[in-house]
């Protein structure tokens, strides 16, 4: 018998009025970075099942694919689904000849927004993040253009991803920032020094990705053996032989003292039933989805209401 669906809590993200599901569905791994793209029809069914289960905060970016993840999500949003969700996407990163480029100039911001509209099939984005900060362009200039998009009704709320505390303050002075997205886990805790206290002070919500260390804290070193050549984690320094042994020792230590169970308790409060084709979704929606496997995880929100 399929497990009964459990109500997903809803929270205020930040202090500007945005309400989202406490668990979010990061869609990146459906199309990019975590191995080959997954079958489109299965991913659309998965998204629909998540929404039906109450996970309505959907996260993507124009760089995932690039572009293909937004196209996928756009198809999933058809048929009245758009009205049921809080849609977040990002701009500011592109790849040219294999080289990453960061953009924050006003013309790029506006062009990127229009491009996301077309791929997603929408005329308004609920939460629009600057994916990475362009150090060549003052943050005040970038946020100024985003503020215009808010005033024009094209986006509702502004977010930043991977921004410093000082950048967050400067941005917030131009227009209220609703959310900051960052990596936050047992081995990524630098944000606790300045960024998270700054967000608390300013009433900015935190959207944490990879709370289980990109799957390491749920699987340990054996995770690396299962990664395909197309999985970007295979090339991350933390998973290389010179670091893996030490990280494996840390994993065993936290596993013995129960920290991994506590991490599961933090990120997995929602039991989900059976999706299409009777494939069961795990209880956990950990870091940024990765096909919703417990070692690969969803977006977790922490709300600060100021």
From Swiss-Prot:
Q: Where is this region: Disordered?
A: 272-306
InterPro entries attached here?
AKR, Aldo-Keto_reductase, NADP_OxRdtase_dom, NADP_OxRdtase_dom_sf
Which tissues does the record link to its expression? Leaves and roots.
- Catalytic residue positions: 64
Which residues carry the site feature described as Lowers pKa of active site Tyr? Answer: 90
Q: Does the keyword Mitochondrion apply?
A: no
The annotated regions of Basic residues compositional bias extend over 276-289
Query: Record's superkingdom?
Result: Eukaryota
Question: Which Gene3D superfamilies does the record cross-reference, listed alphabetically?
Answer: NADP-dependent oxidoreductase domain
Q: Keywords assigned by UniProt?
A: NADP, Oxidoreductase
Residue positions annotated to bind NADP(+) are 210-220
Please state, per the UniProt record, what induces or represses the expression of this protein: By N-(aminocarbonyl)-2-chlorobenzenesulfonamide (2-CBSU).
The UniProt entry's GO CC annotations, sorted and at most eight, read: cytoplasm
Q: Name one GO molecular function term.
A: aldo-keto reductase (NADPH) activity
Q: Which residues bind substrate?
A: 131
**Record-stated family:** Belongs to the aldo/keto reductase family. Aldo/keto reductase 2 subfamily.
PANTHER family the record matches: AFLATOXIN B1 ALDEHYDE REDUCTASE, ALDO-KETO REDUCTASE YAKC [NADP(+)]
Query: What protein name does the entry list?
Result: IN2-2 protein
The protein's organism comes out as Zea mays
Q: Which gene encodes it?
A: IN2-2
